[in-house]
Design a protein with these regions (language model features):
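Active-site neighborhoods and metal-handling regions in enzymes and metal-associated proteins
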Residues: 1-143
């Protein structure tokens, strides 16, 4: 699997290239690991040097929205509970949720059911069950 490096306004799945990171950039590293046929997917965004206050706000709110979603990822809750927690927090902080890319189930395949959007009403979608493995990958925009 590829390691993706997305810089600044590239939301996700960017590929490493010849661009040299500059002070003030944001870079997101997205990696997939295969261990004995089971996949793991992780992405994290980093500030390069000093970023603007607006960019730092984006990083901080995205991280907090991830943890707000994780807090609701418990057996018996629904996917929509996670989705709504992310959207509610992000929009309350003046950011918008990217709707073109979502989280997903993961296991022996990279993209499995259920889909995990980062927006939508609570109490909807599949119930979380023991043994279910999902990715929660909030992607937010300024404005």
């Amino acid at each position: 699997y590829a390691t993706c490096a997305s810089v600044n306004d590239v939301i996700c799945h960017g590929f490493p290239g010849k661009y040299v990171l500059q002070d003030g950039d944001i870079v997101t590293i997205d990696m997939v690991v295969n261990l004995n046929g089971w996949l793991a997917d992780s992405a994290w965004s980093y500030a390069v040097g000093q970023v603007t206050p607006e960019a730092q706000h984006l990083l901080d709110v995205t991280k907090t929205s991830l943890y707000k979603g994780i807090e609701l990822a418990v057996i018996g809750n629904r996917i929509g509970d996670i989705s709504n927690a992310i959207q509610t927090y992000a929009e309350g902080e003046g950011l918008s949720v990217v709707r073109e890319f979502i989280g997903h189930g993961i296991g022996e395949k990279m993209h499995e059911e259920p889909q995990v959007p980062h927006y939508g009403p609570p109490h909807r979608g599949p119930r979380l069950k023991e043994g279910m493995v999902i990715t929660i990958e909030p992607m937010l925009n300024i404005g």
